Amino acid sequence: MAILAFQKPDKVLMLEADAKFGKFEFRPLEPGFGITVGNALRRILLSSLEGFAITTIRIEGVEHEFSSVPGVKEDVTNIILNLKQVRFKQVVEEFESEKVSITIENSSEFKAGDIGKYLTGFEVLNPELVICHLDSKATMQIDITINKGRGYVPADENREYCTDVNVIPIDSIYTPIRNVKYAVENFRVEQKTDYEKLVLEITTDGSIHPKEALKEAAKILIYHFMLFSDEKITLESNDVDGNEEFDEEVLHMRQLLKTKLVDMDLSVRALNCLKAADVETLGDLVQFNKTDLLKFRNFGKKSLTELDDLLESLNLSFGTDISKYKLDKE
């Protein structure tokens, strides 16, 4: 059954943007879609984007988080609270984790910027953050491990990174998003005034541009919603064999193979030859070998080259077994 056309924008307007703040406008939307889209994006942005954070520390002479460090004003608990606030940006793509040993001496303060001096794959975004204060003669030796993650992970789940009895796991705040606000306003389209405009404000820690953060959140939503878009999904099925129907690649291929050839940019001659042979979809076409196609009436090498180029552009090939995609299950 055909779906009635929705009033929707053809692009997202970026009203303001810098490294940490972005303001976006999305309009026009059907009534009710402003809060639907805005709330979903806000939740994903705050909870589900990847980032980098400290997962474990080891301080020389300290056995647990309730200890104190000689010559250091703050106890270990407060040091951990401050370390949780250090923000990192990946500067070398190959680095998804890094462990460094840091020595602080002849200094009255240990700042986040001191960590950055020892890092290879990451940049510290808030170098002026004070971790702790030291006596003039005190020396502090600390090992820090940085890992990639999503959202918020409590210390208990970071125990897997503890390789030594004196290593202390800490809570990790991976999310690069500091704040997300959205507002829904009325918007007029011709004579109708009940359409909506969604205004979205995103503040990051600087490790990701607000525009990229919005794109990543949208991708996560699309990935989850596409699982409901395939006609052949049986939502009540719990058997193992049914799991493949939820595989992203399988879903993509099933949708692609159902594409009508008349919707592709093919010559009239090639389309007529295929239609005469009851070949109507990409799924029908890829099951044939090239030699089989040349047996079709009025089908020549020029048409074969045209189809070969089409399939190659779609990462498809002739002689494909499509049985695993279960296109016959309507």
Curated annotation (Swiss-Prot):
Catalysed reactions, semicolon-separated: RNA(n) + a ribonucleoside 5'-triphosphate = RNA(n+1) + diphosphate
Task: Tell me the domain comment.
Answer: The N-terminal domain is essential for RNAP assembly and basal transcription, whereas the C-terminal domain is involved in interaction with transcriptional regulators and with upstream promoter elements.
- Keyword Metal-binding (UniProt): no
Which gene carries the instructions for this protein? rpoA
Keyword set includes Nucleotidyltransferase: yes
Recorded hits in Pfam families, A to Z, give:
RNA_pol_A_bac (PF01000), RNA_pol_A_CTD (PF03118), RNA_pol_L (PF01193)
Entry-linked InterPro entries: DNA-dir_RNA_pol_insert (IPR011262), DNA-dir_RNA_pol_RpoA/D/Rpb3 (IPR011263), DNA-dir_RpoA (IPR011773), RBP11-like (IPR036603), RNAP_asu_C (IPR011260), RNApol_insert_sf (IPR036643)
- What does the sequence similarity comment in the record state about its family? Belongs to the RNA polymerase alpha chain family.
Function comment: DNA-dependent RNA polymerase catalyzes the transcription of DNA into RNA using the four ribonucleoside triphosphates as substrates.
Name listed for the protein in its UniProt record? DNA-directed RNA polymerase subunit alpha
EC numbers listed for it are 2.7.7.6
Source organism phylogeny: Bacteria, Pseudomonadati, Bacteroidota, Bacteroidia, Bacteroidales
Q: Which organism is it from?
A: Bacteroides fragilis (strain ATCC 25285 / DSM 2151 / CCUG 4856 / JCM 11019 / LMG 10263 / NCTC 9343 / Onslow / VPI 2553 / EN-2)
**One annotated Gene Ontology cellular component of this protein:** cytoplasm
Q: Give positions of region: Alpha C-terminal domain (alpha-CTD).
A: 248-330
